[in-house]
């Protein structure tokens, strides 16, 4: 029986292994779409900071700081990802940091009710660094687990699943939390699920 080799020339993982890798991106990408692009960052800028210009400036400083940290450490991380055999513990740590940080975003509120502004900035910074590190270790797994002839298929599947997961999550949040109580459409619940209160911007923080 011929052994199937990966792009790295090592024995490829089973289909369960490389398809699980693809679904890993489906779990990660919705966070970026929901938090960074469409919902939380605009909420942070306009509501928490209270000044969209200053808010965007703070987000710019966060992104610049994350970029500096990555520039200083990414080569070392890449070397670790390429030379250390076990990458899953690193993925567990980075994904766990993202999950815990995402949970704590619930307490990012305007005024003095939740985390302070600079605590919120620090939390977002940590999450964004963890997200970037998660990408490094996740992407580094592809050459060693995927059969060489299926690398494009698996990579494309991961990209598609990531986008599908992000769009699905966006639609769910819209129809479960954001639109009920605002739009009088017959197929919507009368009130947001889980008792979400729009006046407290809970639909932006959930």
How does the language model describe each region?
Residues 52-55, 87, 175-206:
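A membrane-interface helix-boundary motif in multi-pass transporters
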Residues 71, 92-114:
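C-terminal ends and interior cores of transmembrane alpha-helices
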Residues 7-71:
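Helix-loop boundary and gating motifs at the non-cytosolic
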Residues 155-177:
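Glycine-rich segments within core transmembrane alpha-helices of 12-TM secondary carriers
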Residues 81-97:
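Cytoplasmic membrane-interface "Motif A"-like loop-to-helix N-cap segments
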Residues 123, 129-160:
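Cytoplasmic helix-loop-helix junction between adjacent transmembrane helices
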Residues 59-79, 100, 170:
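Central cavity-lining transmembrane alpha-helices of secondary-active solute carriers
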